[in-house]
Amino acid sequence: MSDSTILQCVDLQKTYTGLDVAVLNGISLQVDAGEQIAIVGTSGSGKSTLLHLLGGLDEPSAGSVQVMGKSLAALSEAERGTLRNRALGFVYQFHHLLPEFTALENVALPLMIRRLSRDEALGRAKDVLMQVGLGHRLEHMPGELSGGERQRAAVARALVTNPRCVLADEPTGNLDRHTAQGVFDLLLALNRDQGVALVVVTHDLELAARMQRQYRLQDGRLHTI
């Protein structure tokens, strides 16, 4: 592991009770600062499971995960949460914006959870929303935004804590082709301009091909494309 390594997993395995076959079987991956990594695979191949393990949202059956040089297994749940919130951002296929809050408030929530003042959190959220092209939608509720705008707000929420790496699970899965390309353009621009590493799980081979490194998850293992 180099000083620039943000995420690393070694011989990662995951099995579930009642299943004879490992969902993940001996996966090793290193994510360095500023990298772009795409992971493709069929539905049920374990792509989301791998992303959850990398993000410390689930525990492996065997193997290890390190974030910023720290083994997740050696940390308490509270310590894992603190490290996760400091180093990682998450974007999902479903935006998970809270319908009762404005776009601005939704993006500010991670900062408020970290006990920043409301004014400071809203100020930072406004800056990030402007970066993703939603400066004119600050006071709109999620239901008043288009699908692409909601996903841009979700990207802004992932970025508001200044993460070193964004883990994106099918971030364009519910979008039409044109809107999906726009969201992907946004992620790549943020990677280029801010040096945020990207690990993107997607079923879209055309979008995956735009990333620096591409892997296919098949039979529990990662294969370089």
From Swiss-Prot:
GO terms for biological process: lipoprotein localization to outer membrane; protein localization to outer membrane. CDD domains: ABC_MJ0796_LolCDE_FtsE. Its EC number is 7.6.2.-. Residues 7-225 form the ABC transporter domain. This is Lipoprotein-releasing system ATP-binding protein LolD. It comes from Methylobacillus flagellatus (strain ATCC 51484 / DSM 6875 / VKM B-1610 / KT). One of its GO terms (cellular component) is plasma membrane. It is found in: Cell inner membrane. SUPFAM superfamilies: P-loop containing nucleoside triphosphate hydrolases (SSF52540).
